[in-house]
């Protein structure tokens, strides 16, 4: 098991969580939306064919030789058609930003 360090950049950010000890990765939580006004604290409307940037409010240190992968949750992808714009987000171990 590899250790990934997460750092919250604001107090109101949710740290990533793991669904179980056998989970393949961590669940990320939305913190803010770029160029978009949410309907309320829990609802965001993405128009058909539209895109929004969703920030997590965290930074992380990925161990050398590994990468961070951002994938759509299966339920959102199949039921709602929501997925990262490029389908898979790749974060290199040496990326800082």
Regions found by a protein language model. Give the residues of each.
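DUTPase catalytic domain/fold
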Residues: 1-97
